[in-house]
Amino acid sequence: MVPFKLKLIPGESIFDQVVFAAIKSILAGELKAGETFPSVRTLALDLKIHPNTAHKVVQHLIQERWLMAQPGVGTVVAQPPKARAGDRKRLLEDDVEKLVVEAMRVGAGLNEVQQAVADTWNDMRGLKVVSNDH
């Protein structure tokens, strides 16, 4: 059984969505370092995706060091990789730009965007922070 949720969004790459869901699950602590990651076959069957897509997902996560292949054990979750300080900004730029464009499109202000980011951050960390803004 796949230990993470996947909400397929029409028009977006299934590969990208599965990779994102797996990484989100690792960062949220739902999948912990050392735990066995589902096999390619299990991913394909449970998520109803093509086995080639499932294979690409696992290989990508190994290449990006989110997973490790361990002979005799299978694929296991690795410690989440840390980006160097100089790389973090570059890695975030495209996604931040997309967020800002979408916020502007719907008329959200900077405070709303910051609060949404803080809420999501805290939800993923299992924290509940009460805000005075809402």
Where in the sequence are the language-model features?
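Extreme N-terminal segment that seeds HTH/winged-HTH DNA-binding domains in transcriptional regulators
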Residues: M1-T36, T42, R90-D94, V100-K128, ...
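A surface-exposed regulatory interaction patch that couples sensing to output
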Residues: A78-E97
